[in-house]
Amino acid sequence: MKKEQIGFNAGKIWQKLEKDLTDTNVNKIKRELKMNSMELGTALGWLARENKITFVSDEKTFYVLPVE
């Protein structure tokens, strides 16, 4: 996967988070944006490395939230 594609996918996730924070379930983001696991993971890693997102979880589900 090219770095440009990872950055593009990170941008799609970021736009979704800016638009709608009502459901930030990682699996739902994956489905809505039609990404495979590799695409989602690398894009989330990109955003985390830039300190733009944080991860929270309950017992079964991971969520992504923008860093304030």
Identify the meaning behind each predicted range.
Residues 2-10, 23, 57-68:
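Short, cationic-aromatic polyanion-contact patches
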Residues 48-58:
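A short, conserved structural fragment
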Residues 28, 41, 58-59:
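Short loop/turn and capping residues at structural boundaries
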Residues 6-32:
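Short amphipathic alpha-helical interface segments
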Residues 18, 45-48:
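Short amphipathic alpha-helical segments enriched in leucine
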